[in-house]
């Protein structure tokens, strides 16, 4: 978290499955990710970022929400991706899928067109890295990069993303 706060990232993610508190982010836009159940008491007073709660439904608590689905086993059809993400009751729907072949990659690309809500679509693994580089092609609100160790297969460092330019 300290590395992320000291970086020139546009936004940082604080994963509360890896930390036990939300550190001072110095006013940077922040995504606080809860993988073990939402606990509002862990958020600092006046929190003004996003909360990612997986696919858990949250009551309206006045905080922007991200629902996320991760499939490390592969990529479902584009129709399944669209149906799942459009059902998510959040401000932004996130889907991250392990890309095994070009068919999986095509499924992610095809899903980006018909999605009705704000979203982040990512491919994981070596073949999925292109979705992180060309994230604007998918209509993504943002993408994820690391400043220390990757937290997902195929995730690039912030330095690598900056070298590749804004896409």
Predicted feature locations:
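C-terminal alpha-helical cap/extension of soluble enzyme domains
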Residues: 110-167
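Structural recognition of alpha->loop->beta junctions
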Residues: 10, 41-52, 84-93, 134-155
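A short acidic, amphipathic alpha-helical/loop segment
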Residues: 2-3, 22-26, 57-61, 107, ...
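Short, structured coil segments at secondary-structure junctions
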Residues: 26, 46-47, 61-63, 115, ...
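Short, acidic/polar
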Residues: 1-7, 39-44, 75-86
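Catalytic beta/alpha-barrel core
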Residues: 11-21, 31-59, 64-77, 91-102, ...
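A short, acidic, amphipathic alpha-helical segment used as a generic capping/interface helix at domain edges
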Residues: 85-86, 103-113
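Short acidic active-site motifs
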Residues: 77-81, 104-107, 130-131
């Amino acid at each position: 978290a300290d590395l992320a706060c000291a970086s020139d990232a546009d936004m940082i993610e604080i994963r509360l499955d890896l930390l036990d508190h939300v550190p001072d982010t110095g006013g940077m836009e922040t995504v606080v990710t809860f993988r073990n159940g939402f606990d509002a008491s862990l958020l600092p007073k006046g929190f003004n970022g996003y909360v990612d709660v997986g696919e858990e439904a949250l009551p309206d608590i006045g905080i922007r929400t991200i629902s996320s689905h991760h499939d490390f086993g592969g990529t479902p059809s584009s129709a399944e991706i669209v149906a799942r993400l459009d059902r998510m009751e959040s401000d932004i729907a996130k889907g991250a899928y392990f890309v095994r072949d070009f068919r999986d990659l095509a499924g992610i690309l095809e899903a980006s067109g018909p999605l009705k809500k704000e979203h982040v679509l990512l491919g994981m693994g070596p073949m999925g890295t292109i979705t992180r580089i060309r994230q604007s092609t998918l209509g993504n609100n943002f993408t994820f990069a690391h400043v220390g160790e990757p937290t997902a297969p195929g995730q690039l460092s912030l330095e690598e993303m900056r070298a590749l330019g804004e896409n």
